[in-house]
């Protein structure tokens, strides 16, 4: 019997085709996974870019409507004044010759109040506001009326805390407050060419502390545009003394004079005094504070002695 010759082992029919199908399938599987990873990288990059943009946006407190910065935080201004036409708001009130605005405008100076004085008076605000504070982002302390934000309401701190006030504030605190008020009053009188003796402190004059906490009541919504003469009536000249620094202590929170086509903004700086006539010629608002805490004091003056208030005293 002749020996049988064995050939090479037979490969099952269709096995190479199966391998080709598996290889093709593997490639097909790999492609979606690679595409997925590519898209994930793109999405991650996009999210990262958006986050960085938001952080940068927040850090500088950009406002689309602001066209010009008239006083930057880093500047030390001896005095800058911009004259604007007076509105008709003053015509609806009793006029006082030599005082009621006939020259209108806005000014900024960094040499009237020192940074040391600003730090000292800020400590007065911090002591008073430590007794309460709004549930929302804006708290006020009025040493004249005693109004203090507490939760969603206001209390009279002199009645509420009674004799304990003597342990919180000092005579030196109130003397500093009076000295600063007088310096600001003289600055306004000189800028507008009127006699300081014709100006009377008026209400409300108050400390403000603003942070990024969500508003809880209408009193916390400080960012709406308004006209002081319309809102308060008694105001003829408004001033703000800033007690903290933009972009160091807080972001956002710049002061914006609203003008058609070209808004003007003031960047707060501790010791900076911003002042202006209170009519519609100086429609304004404050940007929302995005982070940190912004301190300031609003000091308002009237030409009407009937609307005047006395300096606060520690009794």
Swiss-Prot record:
It is a single-pass type II membrane protein. The active site is at residue 294. Gene3D superfamilies: q2cbj1_9rhob like domain. Residues 1-31 are annotated as: Disordered. SMART domains: P4Hc. It is found in: Membrane. Glycans are attached at residues 211, 263. Binds 1 Fe(2+) ion per subunit. It holds the Pfam family 2OG-FeII_Oxy_3. Its cofactor is Fe(2+); L-ascorbate. Its EC number is 1.14.11.-. Keywords: Dioxygenase, Glycoprotein, Iron, Membrane, Metal-binding, Oxidoreductase, Signal-anchor, Transmembrane, Transmembrane helix, Vitamin C. GO terms for molecular function: dioxygenase activity; iron ion binding; L-ascorbic acid binding; oxidoreductase activity, acting on paired donors, with incorporation or reduction of molecular oxygen. Residues 18-31 have a biased composition (Basic and acidic residues). Residues 1-41 are cytoplasmic. GO terms for cellular component: membrane. It is an enzyme of class 1 (oxidoreductase). PANTHER family: 2-OXOGLUTARATE AND IRON-DEPENDENT OXYGENASE DOMAIN-CONTAINING PROTEIN 3, PROLYL HYDROXYLASE-RELATED. This is 2-oxoglutarate and iron-dependent oxygenase domain-containing protein 3.
């Amino acid at each position: 019997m002749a020996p049988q010759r064995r050939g090479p082992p037979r490969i099952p029919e269709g096995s190479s085709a199966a391998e080709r199908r598996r290889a093709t399938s593997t490639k097909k599987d790999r492609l979606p996974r690679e595409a997925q990873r590519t898209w994930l990288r793109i999405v991650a990059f996009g999210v990262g870019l958006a986050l960085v943009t938001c952080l940068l946006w927040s850090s500088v407190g950009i406002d689309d409507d602001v066209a010009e910065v008239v006083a930057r935080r880093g500047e030390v201004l001896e005095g800058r004044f911009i004259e604007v036409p007076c509105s008709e708001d003053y015509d609806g009130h009793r006029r006082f010759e030599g005082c009621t605005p006939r020259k209108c405008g806005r000014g900024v100076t960094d040499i009237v109040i020192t940074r040391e004085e600003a730090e000292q008076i800020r400590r007065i605000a911090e002591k008073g506001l430590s007794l309460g504070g709004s549930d929302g982002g804006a708290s006020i302390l009025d040493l004249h009326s005693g109004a203090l934000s507490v939760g969603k309401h206001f209390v009279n701190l002199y009645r509420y805390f009674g004799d304990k006030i003597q342990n919180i504030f000092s005579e030196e605190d109130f003397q500093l407050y009076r000295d600063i008020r007088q310096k600001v009053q003289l600055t306004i009188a000189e800028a507008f060419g009127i006699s300081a003796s014709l100006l009377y402190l008026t209400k409300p004059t108050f400390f403000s502390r603003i942070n990024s906490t969500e508003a809880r009541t209408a009193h916390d919504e400080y960012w709406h545009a308004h006209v002081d003469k319309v809102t308060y009536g008694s105001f003829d000249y408004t001033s703000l003394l800033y007690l903290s620094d933009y972009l160091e202590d807080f972001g956002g929170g710049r002061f914006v004079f609203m003008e058609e086509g070209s808004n003007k903004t003031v960047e707060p700086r501790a010791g900076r005094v911003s002042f202006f006539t209170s009519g519609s010629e100086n429609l304004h608002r404050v940007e929302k504070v995005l982070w940190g805490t912004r301190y300031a004091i609003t000091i308002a003056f009237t030409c009407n002695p009937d609307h005047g208030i006395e300096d606060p005293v520690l009794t």
